[in-house]
Amino acid sequence: MRGIRWTTTAFLLLTAAPGLAQSANQSAASAADDAFGTSVGNERVGLYNPDSARGFSPVTAGNLRLDGLYIDRPPDFSQRLISGSNIRVGLTAQGFPFAAPTGIADFALRRAGSDPALNATLEVGPYTARRFALDGQTPLTSSISLGAGLDYGREDQPNGTKDYYYTFTIAPVWRPRDGIEVMPFYSRYYWKGWSGQPLYFVAGDFLPPRIRRHENPRQSWAGEVGVAPTFGIHSRASLGPWLLQAGLFKSGFEIEGSAVELFQNVDRDGMGDRQIIELGHRRTWSVSGEMRVSRQFDEGKRRHTLMLNLRGRDRQRRYGGGVTLAFGRVPVDQKGPIPEPDFDLGPPSHDHIRQANVGAGYDLKWLGVGQLSLGIQKVSYRKQAERPGVQLPTSRSNPWLVNAAINVEASKSLVFYGSYSTGLEESPVAPAVASNSGFAPPAILTKQYDAGLRYVISPNVRLVAGVYQIEKPYYGLNASQLFTNLGTIRNRGIELSLTGTIAPGLNIVVGTVLMDATLSGEAVEQGLVGKRPVGSSRRTSFANIEYQLPGAAGVTAVVGYGGRGRTIANRMNSSTIDPANSFSLGARYRFDLGGKPTSIFARVANLTDEYSYQMSGEGLYYSPGRRFIMTLTSDL
């Protein structure tokens, strides 16, 4: 591994030259067309992200795209491979063939251009964290360019845990002629010492007492070691009226040493039963991909597109065998070192999923009138599960999935839209505290309705307003800590987004979601769970305001806000977390250093040091406190 790392670094240093695509002059706020979730590099703005959209997770649901093509992604993408992402919901999802409920997380690959270039990033914070990254590209021939990146850093988690990581990516691009591109890539992400925050489970209808933040690090022996490679090939060919797109990917991770620390039966005085769960060796590998053939037919102002699509995945997973050890009743705010115990791990469990989707679609774009999209898919889903000493029956599902979307241009500035879609999605995996920890339920059938409008207030300002309803089977913890089906969840919401330049030098990304999440079914009727899911909130809001200061060339003030309403804190809905509001304040300075574009972005997150709790299953953990981050980015 050491040889690859230094070879990549040498390549980057030798190709220093102007003009890298991910430059010092870009920001997520300036790139955002709406407030539903946009990232550029390590900056992110918007209401949603790949792990949370409309009350669900696109990652968990399997609704990920790599430049428009399906990928089944168990690990995180390296930022050296990905230049950014967008969350596609409502009107923006209509441009994606075979759109799925929950929303789509579409990741953009870093593509090497035809000019030599090098970009460097140095980041300090939060706390004692440090990060250094390089991204470079150079032409090898008239039709082949090579891109590569390296990232090394030390993270400092909100609980005080320190961990280290590095990533690297190699990604050549072949463009034999206009309209044809083939991009193989290899990316590897390695980390050591990471551990999640401690979880607190209270003994009644109250929250834990205030716990000192950043002073609860993991045990010295408890940090996990993991590696997550992602590699494959992405290609497209535009041949007159024909468009061919294909991608084949392999991704996965292997993790050792995961230890989850939690405190059960926490009382009002801050005493709790201390436990550590060693999860054992975990491994997930998936081969996935998509192939699509499209044919366009132009008819005056109308463009018809017919599509045939094949999508599939083969995922194998090893998990389970973990063990829980108890360390007595202790003050939850006075963690002391524990000698490393001898964990007697049990035998693991295995899952194997095979899925194939065959689909056909039709898209009509009518200039000045609107757009119509229709799609149908036949799915073949098989899941084999093996528990210690038990071979479970194979789970099978062969549904037909449909999607239909329409938008109508009422005027040049006003568009109305509506859609309906069904999907076969993965449900969340059982958390570490479940009696069946790591268990992944069979895929679930989901459906979604949405409608709304987009109004272009001015050439630079856009308003989007919409409503949606999503229904899915709901899995959660029952009274005996078994992760099981507890009924049906229905999320209904109103989304609002306002983005653009509202005055000279003043750019905004503002959005809010008002959501009504409800549960129904036998468990609710019998009083085993409440009518609202754990962790749900009726309001989520976001704002990012950037103002270029007059008289201060290159200086932009940045103000951020993130907030949520009251949050359901337990299964019976008898406890809640108060509304939380977090503000950030920063400044970005753009200038030339030796004739090269450079920027410094300094900001303070959680400016008022707001203290709140968040949910992980039915466990609670505290939000990060006030912290400072400074990022220096320069084209070299």
Protein language model regions, located:
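Conserved C-terminal beta-signal and adjacent last beta-strands/turns
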Residues: 21, 534-636
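A beta-strand signature from Gram-negative outer-membrane beta-barrel systems
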Residues: 34, 55, 61, 65-67, ...
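Transmembrane beta-barrel wall of Gram-negative outer-membrane proteins
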Residues: 117, 123-154, 159-197, 221-242, ...
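Repeated loop/turn-to-beta-strand initiation elements of outer-membrane beta-barrel proteins
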Residues: 143-146, 178-182, 241-244, 299-303, ...
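Surface-exposed extracellular loop regions of Gram-negative outer-membrane beta-barrel proteins
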Residues: 192-194, 198-203, 314-323, 382, ...
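Gram-negative outer-membrane beta-barrel transporters
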Residues: 367-371, 469-471, 485-570
